[in-house]
């Protein structure tokens, strides 16, 4: 029963669209009869357009690659140690990586394996 209401509605809507000017056929061109009319761009404009297109493509690919690598990235963190032994080892490493000038000028005299650790008690007099 609802089917009989549909064709009059369809015909009425097509008529309204035609009267409103929204329903027009596209102009027909013969593909073989007329020559291809391309947009006129100068050589410089074409090169600028090509550069812009390549730049956008590279930027798009870089964004996609960055999003893919974000999912699989593993960040490394150094263990932090603030005890005297760790700080001493860090300073010794820094001194060994710096030059001999720093070693000669700033190296403390009483540094070595006997300095760290447990010291013997001095006998009291």
UniProtKB/Swiss-Prot annotation:
Which positions are listed as propeptide?
Answer: 26-79, 122-125
The entry sums up its family as follows: Belongs to the calcitonin family.
Per the annotation, which location comes first and is thus the protein's main one? Answer: secreted
Sites where Leucine amide occurs are at 116
Q: Which Pfam families match?
A: Calc_CGRP_IAPP (PF00214)
Here the disulfide bonds are 81-86
Keyword DNA repair attached:
no
Q: Provide the protein's localization.
A: Secreted
What species is this protein from?
Sus scrofa (Pig)
UniProt GO BP = adenylate cyclase-activating G protein-coupled receptor signaling pathway; regulation of cytosolic calcium ion concentration
Entry keywords, A to Z: Amidation, Cleavage on pair of basic residues, Disulfide bond, Receptor, Secreted, Signal
Q: Name any GO cellular component annotation.
A: extracellular space
**What domain of life does the UniProt record list for this protein's source?**
Eukaryota
Molecular function (GO) terms for this protein are:
calcitonin receptor binding; hormone activity
Signal peptide extent: 1-25
Enumerate the InterPro entries for this protein. Answer: Calcitonin-like, Calcitonin/adrenomedullin, Calcitonin_gene-rel_peptide, Calcitonin_peptide-like
Supply the gene name.
Answer: CRSP3
Which tissue types show expression of this protein?
Answer: Mainly expressed in the thyroid gland and CNS. Found in the nerve cells of cerebrum, hippocampus, hypothalamus, pons/midbrain and thalamus.
**Protein name as it appears in the record:** Calcitonin receptor-stimulating peptide 3
């Amino acid at each position: 029963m609802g089917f009989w209401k549909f064709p009059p509605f369809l015909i009425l809507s097509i008529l309204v669209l035609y009267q409103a000017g929204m329903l027009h056929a596209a102009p027909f061109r013969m593909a073989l009869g007329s020559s291809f009319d391309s947009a006129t761009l100068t050589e410089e404009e074409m090169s600028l357009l090509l550069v812009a297109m390549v730049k956008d493509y590279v930027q798009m690919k870089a964004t996609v690659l960055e999003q893919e690598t974000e999912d699989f990235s593993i960040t490394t963190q150094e263990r932090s140690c603030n005890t005297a032994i760790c700080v001493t080892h860090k300073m010794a490493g820094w001194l060994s990586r710096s030059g001999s000038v720093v070693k000669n000028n700033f190296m403390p005299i009483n540094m070595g394996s006997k300095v760290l650790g447990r010291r013997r008690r001095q006998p009291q007099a």
